[in-house]
């Protein structure tokens, strides 16, 4: 979905005659820069390794937000006990018990309501197992994005269009602007101002 609608053009300094292809291409460029398929709320799945002795992980896509009428952005979570790597065993007798019951390698469903999360940082704090065993890997299905596209994203979209329209190689073309053309000039179109507006939405890692 495009981040600017025709009714928005006057408010963000774009001529009313701006065609949809400019907005569509600018929207695609924003998604590419933020390393995510969309800034609207959609579902993601990540598999993450936990640091030894720590029961927290950080998700890539922010902000965490429920989809539609959902009450939580956490759809499902599974934790797994794996054989620790060298230097990771904190309680060797406890791990020996776990191995005796064949726990390593098994995925266990966690109640999403038992997991604390920060919607702005994407940090999850996992509960401990009843035996006191830490998980060392989790698979998280969650939703993240903007329920309402804000002024920062709309301003970024408009600025990219203005930058593109002032780029001679793009503006001189009489054909429709497409995403590939915009990507070629992305280093100049996504200027420092645009980067500042989009910084909160850039994925923490490549997805």
Predicted features and spans:
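Divalent metal-cofactor coordination and adjacent catalytic microenvironments
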Residues: 1-207
């Amino acid at each position: 979905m495009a981040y600017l609608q025709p009714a928005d053009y006057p408010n963000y300094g774009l001529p009313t005659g701006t065609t949809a292809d400019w907005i569509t291409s600018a929207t695609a460029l924003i998604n590419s820069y933020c390393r995510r398929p969309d800034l609207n709320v959609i579902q993601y799945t990540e598999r993450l390794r936990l640091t030894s002795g720590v029961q927290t992980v950080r998700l890539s896509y922010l902000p965490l937000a429920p989809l539609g009428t959902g009450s939580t952005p956490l759809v499902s979570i599974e934790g797994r006990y794996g054989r620790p790597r060298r230097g990771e065993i904190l309680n060797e007798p406890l791990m020996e018990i776990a191995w005796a019951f064949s726990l390593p390698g098994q995925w266990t469903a966690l109640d999403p309501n038992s997991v604390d999360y920060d919607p702005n940082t994407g940090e999850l704090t996992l509960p401990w197992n009843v035996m006191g065993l830490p998980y060392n890997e989790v698979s998280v299905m969650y939703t993240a994005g903007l329920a309402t596209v804000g002024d920062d994203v709309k301003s970024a979209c408009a600025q990219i269009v203005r930058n593109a329209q002032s780029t001679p190689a793009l503006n001189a073309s009489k054909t429709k602007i497409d995403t590939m053309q915009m990507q070629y000039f992305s280093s100049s179109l996504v200027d420092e101002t645009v980067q500042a507006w989009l910084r909160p939405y850039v994925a923490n890692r490549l997805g």
